[in-house]
């Protein structure tokens, strides 16, 4: 709860939003008379806290507002998908739509729940969708969103809409959750990963608790150009084996294993493609005593 639909729902009550349809936003009765100028959701959290502990998870909905939530493959919409995932985390990104504000949704949700409710309460995004479900641009957006959710510490996410195995977005999700059809998944302990321009190429890393493998997802969002990446690996062995999965042109493939050396891994990603690299944990040699 409260499952508010989006930006205005976070800041204004349902009554104020309806009132504004015919009267504009200059006078908002609930904000002036009930919340006393507080944004609606923070005010609601204070009321819930005063009532005890009525909710176990703080949840909202969010949809980007530049036409991304569609199946459009127009270049302007695809470029919007590439950048608007920053609404989920980036305190320097001002949303260019009618929102006209920094969103930084996941940090904002965490700050609200810690300040106005009970610190550490799980946070959830129980509706979201970046569209492009039948295009590689939608797949790269979904992969970017999943990586952001993990890195930023979102506890629960439920995507709005049906999925089918032939959809690009389905395959992007599979790359994270079951890439080998045997439960192989992206790691659950987030590791730092940085790229110079996440609107062009983004990357996410995590270690798996189960077997200690390091998993790395690299996403080439470029509409019409490959990405040549040089990955510097720190706090890992200087050399080792790498398992490779790739999603390109709506085909998910397991490619031949490769190796890295001197702490550096290089790869080339076709336009609008996703690369999953799995670095198995090296087994220590055992010594038998006689």
How would you name each of these model-derived features?
Residues 205-207, 255-261:
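Short, exposed beta-strand/loop patches in secreted or surface proteins that constitute
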Residues 1-137, 142:
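Noncatalytic carbohydrate-binding groove/subsite architecture in carbohydrate-active enzymes
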Residues 197-238, 275-278:
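Carbohydrate-binding surface patches
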Residues 260-290:
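C-terminal beta-strand-rich structural cap/linker in extracellular carbohydrate-active enzymes
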Residues 125-130, 158-162, 218-222, 231-235, ...:
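Active-site proximal loops enriched in glycine and acidic residues that flank catalytic Cys/His/Asp
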Residues 230-258:
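C-terminal accessory region downstream of the catalytic core in glycan-modifying enzymes
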Residues 11, 87-89, 93-94, 99-104, ...:
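Divalent cation-coordinating acidic motifs and surrounding scaffolds
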Residues 135, 146-215, 248:
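Glycan-recognition and catalytic regions of carbohydrate-active enzymes
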């Amino acid at each position: 709860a409260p499952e508010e639909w989006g930006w205005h729902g976070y800041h204004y009550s349902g009554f104020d939003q309806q009132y504004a349809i015919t009267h504009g936003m200059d006078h908002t009765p609930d904000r002036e008379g009930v919340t006393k100028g507080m944004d609606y959701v923070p005010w609601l959290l204070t009321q819930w806290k005063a009532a005890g502990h009525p909710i176990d998870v703080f949840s909202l909905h969010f949809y980007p507002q530049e036409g991304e939530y569609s199946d459009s493959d127009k270049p302007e919409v695809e470029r919007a998908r590439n950048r608007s995932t920053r609404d989920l985390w980036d305190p320097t990104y001002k949303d260019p739509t009618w929102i006209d504000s920094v969103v930084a949704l996941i940090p904002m949700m965490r700050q609200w729940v810690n300040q106005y409710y009970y610190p550490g309460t799980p946070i959830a995004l129980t509706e979201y969708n970046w569209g492009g479900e039948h295009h590689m641009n939608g797949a790269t957006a979904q992969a970017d969103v999943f990586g952001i959710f993990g890195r930023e510490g979102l506890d629960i996410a439920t995507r709005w809409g049906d999925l089918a195995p032939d959809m690009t977005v389905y395959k992007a999700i599979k790359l994270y959750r079951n890439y080998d059809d045997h439960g192989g998944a992206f790691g659950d302990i987030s590791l730092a990963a940085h790229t110079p321009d996440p609107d062009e190429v983004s990357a996410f890393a995590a270690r798996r608790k189960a077997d200690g493998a390091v998993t790395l997802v690299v996403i080439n969002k470029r509409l019409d150009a490959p990405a040549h990446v040089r990955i510097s690996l720190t706090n890992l062995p200087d050399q080792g084996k790498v398992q490779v999965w790739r999603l390109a042109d709506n085909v998910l493939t397991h490619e031949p294993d490769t190796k890295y050396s001197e702490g550096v891994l290089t790869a080339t990603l076709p336009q609008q493609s996703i690369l999953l690299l799995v670095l198995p944990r090296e087994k220590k040699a055992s010594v038998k005593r006689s």
